[in-house]
Amino acid sequence: MTTKIFVDTNIFIDVFTANPDFVSESKAVLELCEQNIIEGYTTASAITDIFYLIRKLLHDKEKAYQVLGHILNIIKVLPVTNEDVLNACAEHAYDFEDCLQATCAKANHCSAIVTRDEKGFKDFDITLLSPSALVDQYKPK
C-alpha cells in the first residue's frame, strides 16, 4: 500500500520559483509522487494559490493551465468538508490555513505532512517531515 502524504504549498512554490535553497529536495518530493512511490495530496485552496503563482511567474495563462494539469496528474486534491472547516475553526489556530490543511490531511488518513514550515503545523497532532526527511526514507539503501 502506498503511503499517503499531504504536500504543503511551499513544496510546489520551491519548484516553480526554482528556489536555489530548496528546489532539489522539493522536486524530489514531487518526483516520488509522479513515480507513484507515495500518494501526494493537497487541498483545492492550495491548488488555486499555486495556479495564481504560476500564472504570475509565467505571464501566460495557457502555460499555467498546462503546468497545473501536470500537477493534477501527480497530486490528488482532498475534499474539504463542512466538518473539516468546523473542526479547524474550533482550534482557534494562529494560522487557519495550516490548521485546515492539517485537519483535512488527518481526516483523509494521510500519514504525514511534508513541509518546510514545520512550526506552522506543530500543534495539530500529525507527523511532519521536511522534504529531505521524506526523500531520505525512499532512497535506496
Predicted regions and their residues:
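Acidic, PIN/NYN-like endoribonuclease modules and their adjacent C-terminal/linker elements
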Residues: 1-4, 28, 74, 103, ...
